[in-house]
From Swiss-Prot:
Keywords of this entry: Endoplasmic reticulum, Lipid droplet, Lipid transport, Membrane, Transport
One GO-annotated biological process of the protein: positive regulation of autophagosome assembly
Membrane topology term: Peripheral membrane protein
Gene Ontology MF annotations: lipid transfer activity
Source organism (scientific name): Xenopus tropicalis
UniProt record similarity statement: Belongs to the ATG2 family.
Domain spans labelled Chorein N-terminal: 17-119
Record remark: domains: The chorein N-terminal domain mediates lipid transfer activity.
Reaction it catalyzes: a 1,2-diacyl-sn-glycero-3-phospho-L-serine(in) = a 1,2-diacyl-sn-glycero-3-phospho-L-serine(out); a 1,2-diacyl-sn-glycero-3-phosphoethanolamine(in) = a 1,2-diacyl-sn-glycero-3-phosphoethanolamine(out)
Composition bias type Polar residues, residue spans: 1393-1408, 1493-1532, 1690-1718
Protein's UniProt name: Autophagy-related protein 2 homolog A
Chain positions covered by the region annotation Disordered: 241-281, 1292-1323, 1371-1414, 1492-1534, 1684-1718
UniProt keyword annotation of Transferase present: no
Length: 1997
């Protein structure tokens, strides 16, 4: 220092100092120092240097060596002042003051590897010992020997160290500017940090005047420095970019390449804003102090750099654009890519043509060499083979071109994989690790052919990252601890509706904010909460804004380095935190008039409740850099973990916040999109980052606010900055909230966000007083939990976001089939894999239509899995326990509109929506369709194709293009998929309780509870990229519905609890899973089936052009039981549910709802209906194997179609009402069995003209066969049940009916005449009579012209007073008119009679069927005139001129005539019920189905009980009944059913039609004009039976058919003829009073009766028991404990009392005007149009005197009738009959009277052989009479002789043969009797069997013709001789065995008498066969009649 004190001039000293500064610091200065810049005062120890410009090249080299992320582009120092206290250099501080430091920086890449920062600290810190050596060193050469320590040197070094420690540095007015210049914009952004004052000193010497001891040999391990900052502020500026000083570090070489327009996605360009002036964005209040602790010795623990800071408070005011640009700066600063890896990209070159040819040749050679030489087991791929999908090949997505060609392993091992990165598509795609196509299986070959292209770390399963290195192995590098007293961040909204002065980008807004902030920033955080700050900030910021306020913020950052791993961790905690949105509503320009509304984005409870911070954020980032040797194969791995711990907080969720915050993310999204585009064009990512975020909160209060959707155009919408929400909201309290997010950049893996919680309680509030708990979700026990594992399943919400470039497994499989397996393409027979669908792929046809059925569980699971895997956004919700409660329809309607309309229909602002979704949701934003991922396609040379052949090339090109075209049309991601899984859930709804007339009941409500177990709801929108296609699927393993129509009101629960999911005690079970006793008996129910109980699939197609939305709904219900409860019309469970669900959609602005078309297909499999009457002691169960319902529901349309298909259903009855468990096989009896039933219902709303063009309601029904299996008691029970249901017996006690007059021949009450009837019959009589018509079923047929009848003169009897003259109409009784109304005398028939054709009663049969077809002698016809006296017909000429025949006068019918169709002149009916193609088989059994009685075991087990039913013969003419095997247990019946006693009544193809016509409205009503009368039709019924049969199946009877249609050669059956036809027309009475009057017409075809005595008595007993079992009286006191019907009868007094009550009520009803509908039908006219011949055979067996008397019993037992003939004459009653019973009585009386008077000879003609004798004489008569008759007629005597001979041959010959056959059979019977007498008892001979067989042969197997008769006669004789010889030999051998020769001789002698008689038996039997063949040869009808009359052999065994 002494040299500096020499008396030198100041100029010399200044020049010397300048030289020293220039020598040591000159390379950091841009210019040489001038003398003007330097001023010195060495004596006082002060110096000053001004206007210093830094050399950025040198400074940047220093920063680059330190690995700093910044480079300096400009630097300037205003002045540097140095003060050195020479007098007290060791004890006082040296000061260095830097004034006006201005540094401009910009981000740059780090050039060195991680971990160099710590080395830079030590390199730039020179020790004092080194400095002292340099100062005292004189010679530069090295010493010859090691230097020795010098004592002076140590002292000098100690002094230097002491001085350096006492240096204090002060920065005044420092400005640090960081600029960022994005390459895609001409505007740059800059962040300036203004520091008013910054003090730097050593902590050890701060405020210490004493000398600090220093040890230069052992420097301190830690050095602590103090930084004190004051007046810190942040500023922001946007500027136009200019050419900056070039950086010394090499820039990105790829940035200089020209950007191809085709490779950049076309994003909308935003207008570049103008440069903005610099404005303040932040300020720090209070003192800021940083303590920097440096570690100088690595042996000590702790970080090398430790910074501890305390900051008073920070206030930020940032616009969304500023946030985006600042984020861009931070992102640029955080880039840490290695330049070595980037330089490696320069070696990439595109593949040329030579490379492609080389790869193709190599591939062809390797394919020809076979797989054995290609694939060598790779030990690295062994773990990969254990993956579940072992056949799946994974490859780099970008390497889908020639770079993936197969080459040898040795060649590919030395080739850089990046050599072809720029070929074809690779430079346009984001490479990622994604599943590829299944080219080859590692399991098959041991190694994939592309193993060389696989990443080396592929053996690690995805999602399971490698474990990070332990913390002990990583050394701490840096530790930062900051404590902020307070923090506020204010982000104003950007709105286009504010004035320019209020633009947040305007500097005036920021200046006003910080000016107002200065008034309260020092006392901002002094209160206990933040409520007092709201008013202050409202003054500071007049714009809507988002504000974050925090107190006691602590930030801890730590960095650790070791082993190529760089780990950083950040911990942030807030003592108190509040995030608010402040909205300034209103359009007024005055700032003070705007209302302020706050939205609590996140607020916390009072901190006094807990000492913990309210929010803690833990962030950890780990980066692993591969070593230099493995850098080519591996990539940089970056993993980040964020854990957020929150205390109890409250948040408001408003979707409109996305609009208001959209500006924050808009610029970021665009900026990110451009960076992604740069990424497409520059390089592949060299790092993959795993991001894991977790948010944990013990309790959270979430308020879901419902937005008001606005779908109008943008110009018409409300300002997006305004908050538009409903008053009502959903408040949810969530416990143990856990949000977990995991994403991986650089791959195609989905970003997943999982939310779990333990409990959720939701309360709906309307903003006023209503608070309704509506939802509760809780955790549930895990049934599969293992010991020590998780015992509970927590509710979870999983959101997955898939990149748009993701290819679904379905498309990959299709690509595999189409593009790889070319032989399969060439094979047309190979079936393609069906596309996954929620509808069943198994085609089920009904007639010509394909049934739409939901998919089975496996298909549904595949569809959901594939859809979830290929959807851009997926939502999966799992609810272990859930309970939803709707206390009223109003609450449900409000929630429906809020959730389904407001939330789902809300859309963000179009300008901001894309940016928000891309920034917040997309894992890979803006990956456009231009960069679609291609799959690998094999070269053509692999298939040995000539590449020069244009034909073959074009062929394979077409296949390839077809696959591309199909994938292009179908490929695409589904937009959104949602899946909700409910393990156990319940929905409780309180419905409105309505009484009669739909009036609401006070103080009552209905309750509905729906329980669901293992349910799943799945929905997908924009399926496979189709905007107009969506699907909805619902599945559930178990569903239970409980209902109660009326429940007394009680208070709703305050808090909703999770129920026990048991049966609610106060509700009735309605729908539930079938019990085991029911489901086990259904064929469709199998124990191993995995069908869901409920399956629903909905396809939603939206036609945007027509604005029509079509719903295709398929519902499947499997194994369910419906418990039917009879209720009032508005109290049934379905009506209450439909009324509850019938809500009104609130209108949405700008949205016009589309027209909805719903096509519904409902399928019920193995379902049942359980009905338990309240006042009837029976149980009813209806089962159906398959029930299908199809309908189309179109809103605002007039037509509705509903179709039912019922397959294999049955009805069961049981008398065991006390059984707790339903056992179908044990306790129930099947009484009704339906094979197939189809029902179609069509409704029409009508039109505006009120004139019907089609029926308002139409029902059409048809079926295959209907089986009824009943005994007398079960049939009576079925009738009782029918009456009970028809009368709604559960709702009230049915009234007591009038006892029947006569049933089954037993007179229970003397018959009454029409005049003695009471004025009003009970209503039940009319209902029963009308029920006879409504129970009919339908068929098609044809109508024939009504044959005109003979005009009958008016009989005098018709002019007499009508017997119904005393009948009074109710209206006449009410009006007091007691006069007797007499029917007006009928006018002459030719004028006044109503035309039957006009009334729709045309005849369907005539007499032509009954007359001889050869004669056609018309005896009587209208227009014939007066017949001649001699009776011979005479031809009369009415016209002398020739007759002109006009062709086509009668129009030809277009098709067969429908008998059910009314005449054309009839009006359109209002209601139509049509039954067609219904066949009914009624099986009548003996015994009893109910009760404890059991049949005789011998009879019950007889062979007939097993075979007679199944061998029942059908109709020989036609058989419409399918021989479907019936379930044996169904036909088994009850314990007392006797199967040996069985009769079958079959009605084949029954048709029925009922039409009701509208009531007349006025006088102008259209009427039917018929003559002089006008009739108003009210209803019309047609009942047609095509064939009626009664079959005899009694074991004791040999009869086959009891009753059937008679046909013969003379009387053949007409085609399409009907056996029974009944037509009824109801018209309005002439006087207009009373009920409708009816015209009844009936026709019947000829009948044949074969009556067995046992069958006759069985039918009599059956119907007698049936009549006695029908009881319609149900006492009022009968309840659930009702007595049995067979219990003790009531007392006579009780019966009389009830009868009087019933009669009194009937009389009261009679007085009412509406009682006319309950009266019996008045038949104005009854006609039996056809004369029906009946042929009767009767076979008596035994005398019975118990039931019918002695004489009648003897007559019935001994009578034998054969072809007794009787006729039912035509009937025509015009005097009127009241009631159907009177019609039946009238017909029976007329027929019996006619039979007694006129038909006794015909009946007696069939007694014994009388029929044959009569036929014999009839043939002789015809032989002589017919020639005479023919000669008298036309003179053709030869024709008469032919007719006489034919009649003689058919009548006389057949009668003679019949008589001869009877004589022979009598001889045979006598011989058989003698044979039985003479035959010895032992041994049993076979002759008895032969006799038995001959009897059967005689009855059932008569030969068909003479040839067969001769053959059977020969066989009979031959077998008789053989049997006789065999019998003698057998007797002799047995006698010899027993007694020797004596026994043999004795046996032969005993056998001689029967042997003598045996030839007579054989001869008569052979003769009988011969005679029978001859008779059948002459009369074929006789053989057919025998076949129909007698059973076959099988039926008798």
């Amino acid at each position: 220092m002494s040299r500096w004190l020499f008396p030198w001039s100041s100029s010399i000293k200044t020049r010397a100092c300048r030289y020293l500064l220039q020598h040591y610091l000159g390379h950091y200065l841009e210019e040489r120092l001038s003398l003007e810049q330097l001023s010195l005062d060495l004596y006082n120890g002060s110096g000053r240097l001004t206007d210093i410009h830094l050399d950025i090249w040198s400074v940047n080299e220093l920063l680059d060596s330190a690995g700093a992320p910044l480079e300096i582009i400009d630097g300037f120092i205003g002045s540097i002042s140095v003060t050195i206290p020479w007098s007290a250099l060791v004890t006082e501080n040296c000061t260095l003051e830097v004034s006006k430091l201005q540094v401009t920086c910009r981000p740059k890449y780090r050039g060195a590897a991680q971990g160099t920062e710590s080395q830079s600290w030590s390199s730039c810190m020179t020790t004092s010992m080194q400095l002292a050596q340099e100062c005292l060193k004189e010679q530069p050469e090295e010493p010859s020997e090691p230097p020795q320590p010098i004592e002076g040197l140590e002292m000098f070094a100690q002094t230097i160290e002491t001085v350096l420690r006492r240096i204090k540095v002060t920065f005044i007015d420092t400005i640090v500017r960081i600029e960022n210049n994005p390459g895609d914009s001409n505007l740059g952004t800059a962040l300036e940090i203004h520091i008013k004052r910054l003090d730097y000193c050593d902590e050890a010497v701060r405020d210490s005047p004493h000398t600090v001891p220093v040890d230069i040999h052992q420097p301190p391990a830690f050095i602590q420095k103090i930084l004190q900052l004051s007046g810190v502020s942040l500023h922001y500026e946007e500027f136009k970019t200019s050419v900056q000083t070039p950086s010394p570090t090499p820039e990105n070489p790829l940035e200089s390449e020209p950007v191809q327009p085709s490779k950049t996605p076309s994003w909308p360009e935003e207008p570049q804003p103008a440069p903005s002036p610099i404005q303040q964005i932040g300020s720090c209040s209070g003192c800021t102090e940083l303590t920097i602790k440096l570690k100088q010795n690595d042996l000590f623990p702790g970080p090398k750099l430790d910074i501890d800071g305390k900051i008073g408070s920070v206030h930020l005011f940032l616009t969304p654009r500023q946030i985006s640009n600042l984020q861009e700066i931070l992102d640029a600063l955080s880039i840490s890519e290695s330049s070595a890896i980037r330089e490696k990209l320069l070696k990439s070159r595109p593949l040329d043509l030579e490379d492609l040819k080389l790869i193709e040749q190599d591939l062809n050679q390797q394919l020809q060499s076979g797989p054995g030489s290609l694939f060598v087991p790779d030990p690295e791929l062994v773990p990969f083979q254990t993956i579940e999908n072992g056949d799946m090949f994974y490859s780099m997505a970008a390497m889908t071109n020639s770079m993936t060609s197969i080459r040898s392993a040795n060649e590919l091992s030395d080739i850089d994989l990046e050599s072809s990165m720029y070929s074809d598509y690779s430079s346009q795609q984001i490479p990622s690790l994604t599943p590829g196509i299944m080219l080859s299986s590692p399991r098959k070959y041991g190694r994939t052919p592309f193993s060389a292209t696989l990443p080396q770390n592929l053996h690690k399963l995805p999602g399971k990252s490698s474990h990070p290195p332990s913390m002990e192995l990583l050394k701490p590098e840096m530790l930062l601890r900051l404590t902020l007293g307070g923090l506020t961040v204010t982000v104003p909204h950007i709105s286009t509706y504010i004035s320019p002065q209020e633009d947040p980008a305007c500097p005036e807004v920021a200046r006003h904010f910080f000016r107002e902030l200065g008034y309260f920033k020092d006392s901002a955080f002094s209160g206990r909460d933040f409520s007092h700050l709201r008013g202050q900030f409202e003054k500071a910021c007049h714009l809507s804004n988002i504000r974050v306020t925090a107190v006691a913020v602590q930030l801890v950052c730590e960095q650790r380095v070791g082993g190529g791993t760089h780990q950083s961790s950040v911990d942030l905690s807030c003592g108190r935190l509040e995030i608010l949105e402040c909205l300034r509503q209103g359009e007024s320009t005055s700032r003070r008039t705007k209302n302020t509304e706050y939205t609590k984005l996140m607020t916390f409870c009072s901190p006094s409740t807990s000492s913990r911070p309210c929010a803690q954020i833990h962030y950890k980032r780990s980066q692993k850099t591969p070593t230099r040797s493995s850098r080519k194969k591996q990539e940089i791995k970056v993993s980040s973990e964020i854990l957020v711990e929150l205390e109890e907080f409250q948040t408001d969720i408003d979707l409109g916040l996305l609009d208001r915050l959209g500006s924050i993310f808009q610029n970021g999204a665009c900026r990110e999109s451009y960076s992604q585009n740069d990424l497409h064009m520059t390089d592949v990512p060299q790092s993959s980052e795993d991001m894991e975020i977790r948010v944990v909160a013990s309790k959270s209060h979430i308020c879901l606010q419902f937005p008001v959707p606005d779908l109008r155009p943008s110009l018409e919408r409300r300002p997006w900055a305004e908050k538009a929400v409903r008053k009502d909201c959903l408040q949810m309290e969530v416990a143990d909230l856990d949000i977990h997010s995991q994403s991986k950049t650089g791959t195609d893996e989905a970003r997943k966000i999982e939310i779990t919680f333990s409990d959720l309680h939701g309360v709906y509030t309307d903003g006023e007083k209503l608070n309704v708990p509506c939802i509760r979700v809780s955790k549930g026990a895990d049934p599969l939990a293992k010991a020590g594992g998780k015992k509970f399943i927590f509710p979870s919400i999983l959101v997955a976001i898939l990149p748009q470039s993701k290819v679904s497994p379905w498309y990959l499989a299709q690509d595999k089939i189409d593009d790889i397996d070319h032989p399969s393409v060439e094979s047309p027979c190979e079936l393609k894999q069906p596309e996954p669908s929620p509808f069943s792929s198994k085609r089920t046809m009904f007639e010509t239509e394909e049934m739409v059925i939901p998919a089975d569980p496996n298909e549904m699971a595949d569809f959901q899995h594939v859809t979830l895997a290929s959807s851009q956004y997926t939502l999966e919700i799992t609810l272990p326990r859930a309970h939803v409660f709707f206390p009223s329809k109003e609450v449900y309607e409000s929630l429906y509109n809020r959730l389904c309309n407001d939330l789902l229909m809300w859309e963000p602002v179009p300008e901001l929506g894309a940016s928000i979704s891309d920034s917040l949701l997309s894992a890979e934003p803006h990956t456009t369709s231009n960069y679609q991922q291609d799959t690998f396609r094999m070269c053509k040379s692999a298939f040995k194709l000539d590449s020069d052949s244009d034909d073959e090339d074009s062929h394979f090109y077409s296949v390839d293009e077809a696959a591309r075209h199909r994938r292009g049309a179908q490929d695409g991601q589904s937009y959104f998929s949602a899946s909700v899984t409910i393990l156990k859930g319940r929905i409780t709804a309180w419905t409105e309780a309505k009484g009669e007339g739909a009036k609401k009941l006070d103080d009552h409500h209905g309750e509905v509870v729906l329980d669901v177990e293992n349910g799943c709801i799945f929905s997908v929108s924009k399926y496979r990229g189709k905007e107009d296609l969506s699907y909805l699927c619902i599945q559930s393993e178990s569903v239970a519905l409980y209902h109660k129509a009326t429940v007394k009101d009680y208070l709703a629960p305050v808090s909703l609890e999770i129920p026990t999911f048991l049966h609610p005690t106060n509700l009735d079970p309605t729908i539930y899973l079938s019990e085991e006793g029911v489901s086990a008996q259904l064929s469709g129910a199998r124990k191993d089936r995995n069908q869901k109980m409920l399956s629903l699939a909905v396809r939603i197609d939206l036609n945007l052009v027509k604005n029509v939305k079509e719903f295709l709904v398929a519902l499947r219900l499997d194994g369910a039981t419906l418990r039917h409860h009879m209720a009032l019309p508005y109290q049934s469970w379905h009506s209450q549910i439909l009324d509850f669900l019938d809500v009104v959609d609130e209108p949405i602005l700008g949205y016009s709802p589309p027209a909805v078309i719903t096509v519904l297909h409902t399928h019920l499999f193995s379902c049942a209906v359980d009905y338990r009457p309240l006042y009837l002691p029976i149980r009813v169960l209806i089962t159906a194997e398959t029930f299908t319902l199809s309908s189309n529901i179109v809103v605002d349309t007039s037509t509705f179609l509903l179709r039912f298909i019922l397959d294999d259903s049955a009805l069961y009855l049981s008398d065991k009402c006390d059984a707790e468990v339903t056992d179908l096989r044990k306790d129930y009896v099947c009484v009704l069995d339906v094979d197939l039933l189809e029902l179609v219902i069509t409704t029409w709303k009508g039109n505006a003209s009120s004139k019907l063009t089609q029926p308002l309601f139409e029902l059409r029904c048809s079926n295959n066969v209907l089986h009824i299996h009943t005994c007398a008691d079960s049939c009576a029970m079925l009738v009782n049940l029918t009456q009970y249901v028809m009368n709604n017996g559960d709702l009230h006690c049915p009234p007591k009916p009038e006892p029947p007059t006569e049933i089954a021949g037993q007179k229970l009450q003397p018959p009454e005449g029409p005049s003695s009837l009471p004025p009003c019959l009970p209503a039940e009589t009319a209902q029963i009579n009308q029920g006879d018509l409504t129970d009919a079923l339908i068929d098609t047929g044809r109508t024939g012209k009504e044959q005109p009848e003979t005009a009958i003169s008016v009989d005098a009897a018709l002019l007499e007073e009508s017997p119904v003259s005393v009948y009074l109409f109710p209206e006449e009784i009410k009006s007091g008119n007691k006069r007797q109304t007499t029917s007006p005398s009928p006018p002459p028939l030719t004028e006044g009679r109503v035309s039957q054709e006009s009334l729709g009663l045309s005849d369907t049969s005539g007499d032509s069927e009954l007359t001889d077809t050869d004669d056609f002698c018309i005896l009587d016809a209208p227009g014939i005139g007066v017949p001649p006296k001699d009776g011979e017909p005479v031809v009369r000429k009415l016209v002398d001129s020739p007759i002109a025949v006009r062709d086509g006068h009668f129009s030809r019918p277009l098709g067969s005539t429908d008998l059910l169709k009314p005449p054309a002149k009839f009006p359109v009916p209002e209601t139509r019920i049509v039954l067609r193609e219904i066949s009914v088989v009624w099986h009548l059994y003996g015994g009893k189905d109910f009760g404890s009685s059991r049949p005789n075991s011998a009879r019950a087990q007889s062979p007939r009980s097993r075979t007679s039913f199944h061998n029942a013969r059908g109709s020989p003419s036609r058989s419409s009944v399918t021989n479907r095997p019936q379930n044996t247990w169904r036909t088994q019946g009850g314990n007392g059913r006797i199967h040996d006693i069985l009769m079958e009544i079959q009605l084949t193809k029954v048709s029925f039609q009922h039409e009701s016509y509208p009531e007349p409205l006025a006088d102008g009503e259209e009427k039917l004009h018929t003559g002089d009368l006008d009739e108003l039709p009210l209803a019309r019924q047609v009942f047609i039976v095509q064939e009626l049969e009664i079959r005899d199946r009694l074991a004791s009877s040999h009869i086959n058919k009891f009753l059937y249609l008679y046909t013969s050669e003379k009387m053949p059956r007409r085609a399409h003829s009907n056996m029974l036809t009944i037509k009824a027309l109801h018209v309005r009475p002439e006087a207009g009073l009373g009920g409708p009057e009816c015209y009844l017409r009936m026709s019947l075809m000829p009948l044949r009766l074969n009556i067995d005595q046992d069958a006759l008595f069985f039918l009599k007993d059956f119907f007698t028991s049936l009549a006695s079992g029908i009881q319609t009286i149900v006492p009022m006191e009968l309840g659930s404990e009702a007595s049995r019907l067979d219990g003790p009868a009531k007392s006579s007094s009780d019966c009389e009392l009830e009868q009087e009550t019933s009669q009194g009520s009937t009389e009261d009803e009679t007085m009412s005007p509406s009682s006319s509908t309950d009266q019996p039908i008045y038949f104005r006219e009854f006609r039996f149009t056809s004369e029906v011949p009946i042929w009767l055979d009767y076979q008596g067996k035994h005398v019975t005197t118990e039931q019918v008397g002695t004489f009648a019993g003897i007559l019935i037992g001994l009578a034998q009738l054969n072809c007794s003939e009787l006729k039912l004459k035509r009937l025509y009653c015009r005097h009127g009959l009241l009631g159907a019973d009177k019609v039946v009585s009238y017909a029976l009386n007329e027929w019996l009277t006619d039979i007694r008077k006129n038909q006794l000879p015909g009946i007696l003609g069939g007694v014994g052989p009388m029929h044959s004798v009569v036929q014999l004489f009839h043939g002789v008569r015809d032989l002589f009479w017919l020639p005479i008759e023919q000669y008298r007629k036309d003179g053709r005597i030869i024709r008469g002789l032919q007719r006489g001979a034919a009649s003689f041959g058919t009548s006389t010959a057949s009668a003679a043969l019949e008589l001869s056959n009877r004589l022979v059979q009598a001889i045979q019977a006598t011989a058989e009797t003698v044979y039985d007498i003479l035959s010895p008892t032992p041994p049993v001979s076979r002759c008895a069997l032969d006799v038995r067989q001959s009897r059967k042969l005689r009855r059932g197997q008569q030969p068909a013709d003479l040839r067969e008769g001769v053959a059977k006669a020969y066989d009979t004789v031959r077998e008789g001789v053989i049997d006789t010889a065999h019998t003698i030999c057998e007797v002799a051998s047995r006698g010899h065995e027993q007694k020797g020769l004596t026994g043999a001789v004795g046996g032969v002698l005993r056998q001689i008498p029967p042997t003598v008689v045996k030839p007579f038996i054989v001869a008569t039997e052979a003769t009988s066969n011969l005679l029978g063949g001859m008779r059948n040869q002459i009369r074929p009808d006789a053989h057919k009649e025998d076949a129909l009359k007698w059973r076959a052999d099988e039926g008798q065994d």
